[in-house]
Amino acid sequence: MPNDPLLQPYQLKHLTLRNRIIVTAHEPAYPEDGMPKERYRAYTVERARGGVAMTMTAGSAAVSKDSPPVFNNLLAYRDEIVPWIREMTDAVHEEGAVIMIQLTHLGRRTRWDKGDWLPVVAPSHHREAAHRAFPKKIEDWDIDRIIKDFADAAERMKAGGMDGVELEAYGHLIDQFASPLTNELDGPYGGSLDNRMRFCFDVLKAIRARVGDEFILGVRYTADECLPGGTDKAEGLEISKRLKESGLIDYLNIIRGHIDTDPGLTDVIPIQGMANSPHLDFAGEIRAATNFPTFHAAKIPDVATARHAIASGKVDMVGMTRAHMTDPHIVRKIIEKREEDIRPCVGANYCLDRIYQGGAAYCIHNAATGRELTMPHSIAKAHCRRKVVVVGTGPAGLEAARVAGERGHEVIVFEAASDPGGQVRLTAQSPRRREMISIIDWRMSQCEKLGVTFHFNTWAEAEAIQAESPDVVIIATGGLPHTEVLSRGNELVVSAWDIISGDAKPGTNVLIFDDAGDHAALQAAEFLATAGARVEIMTPDRSFAPEVMAMNLVPYMRCLQKLDVTFTVTYRLEAVEKSGNELVAHVGSDYGGISKQRTFDQVVVNHGTIPLDELYFELKPFSSNLGEIAHDQMIAGEPQSVVRNAEGKFQLFRIGDAVAARNTHAAIYDALRLLKDI
């Protein structure tokens, strides 16, 4: 048996799990027509191939038609899901992993205007703030129907080859019954804890009657809502004991907190700048009190924390879910004693925030995740060695250098600054975003292992690039802040970058005009307000900081509201002029009919970046493709074959913000899909 606690097998009823690491249930929003088709299967199988003991799919699969798929959920109520499930389970089993699926009825945690436009049901009329739907108070015939739906869905999953099912209780219908905050029913399903737990046990009994004993059944539930009047720790312990004593389930999966609001969700699933494993000790208390198999996941991003979770006996199986979105091969690298090669999860939460905004989940710095059908997690060697010159060491340039190095090419990188990182190094200046620098550090480490040559403090000139006789040139020079957005007074403003970097001294009465909606404006506001300034953030948008997204916004708002920062939406800064020692801001609105003046001593503009593209255009006439990228080939993940200049000596590509202001993920994706076939 291995000495590493993480690599020790675990016996869960009739199943032997090959190690202690699991990918807990989550919904990456990859279903097509409610089915786990090729894309979803490829994503799931990659984690099994990487060595996890168990992967749980769906977060969660809907059991009823009145549980609309607001997260693009799998539709477990449809019979046609069975063959798709069978293809997935067979493929996962071939890789040696166990696979389960999570089932749910969302209750009020959805919307009536999704799916079949059926009323949302819950044990009270109280809406969930996050999804805003006012529910119908559930009736007796609804309860009977939904219990049967759970059993039918579990039977389908067993027919599809699943090793078990997990009930998603927390925040969903089962926990809405269990919590005194959300259950206002009379009769057998409301009031006392016995009655509030009745729905959960009726569902479990119905499922167990259908699937038999040789099938794993677990519950992921809230053992402490951390809300006045809600399920508290004492009641959570009692619920845990009752679940064990029922004899109906095989493990507990512990959650602490509530997810009905963005702040609540962010405390349950912490992001960067928040503490690692904040609920691990609590899960350990549940395990100690019940002496029953216990699973847990909540910001356990690294092997050391996971190892502690198992070695200390706090849990039996440790979930590293977001970590496996970043690197699906964590277990393989542990076994091969290559922990330093594990791509680190930086807690940026790009994955979850995209889901909650209605998109598919992507990792901020692994562009292959969710694109396994076209993008590789392991880079294959090229058939012939080429010389690749990269200009810039932001995320795009470093990813290009890393991938080219993995291909076996000679790689030379030029960087004008003394340190790598570009905008990522800048954003990591803020304590809450310090983890972002790992995006850069990991790539630098990988590049050094691959023999990439770096020239820092070197301004790359076109002649110097051509003197290298490259086969491929990658321009990843990024951009500079775009502040030329006013009708007059552009010379009087500073950029958000100036504030974050410390290049501009903070004012005392500051307007931040945020026309980009990304992190920079909020970071600048936090820096200024912490320094004692009175700060107002103004945006012409009707919503605030849309590019930051919901969960990432929470820590900012908690800080900025306490510092009395003012937030103004739907107003546009049009011009700035100097008046003595003050600045007069001329403010209008896209909605028209507004013109007013405000006085500040500093104005900050956040309006994205302008590409640093002079070098690209200097080199373009000498390239074989004249800088052109074949979009169809790029989208399909195929090699670039454009030749527009037969006399050209090299292929030329520009990527990241050297093309246009986008984000870190887009920059890394540019690099991966262009360089993987070079």
Swiss-Prot record:
Cofactor: FMN; FAD; [4Fe-4S] cluster
CDD domains attached to this UniProt entry: OYE_like_3_FMN (cd04734)
One record GO biological process: fatty acid beta-oxidation, unsaturated, even number, reductase/isomerase pathway
Keyword annotations from UniProtKB, A to Z: FAD, Flavoprotein, FMN, Iron, Iron-sulfur, Metal-binding, NAD, Oxidoreductase, Plasmid
Binding residue positions for FMN: G59, Q102, R220, K299, T321, R322
Transmembrane regions: none
Function: Possible NADH-dependent oxidase, may function as a demethylase that converts N-methylproline to proline.
Protein name in UniProt: Probable N-methylproline demethylase
Binding site for [4Fe-4S] cluster: C345, C351, C363
EC number assigned by the record: 1.3.1.-
Species per Swiss-Prot/TrEMBL record: Rhizobium meliloti (strain 1021)
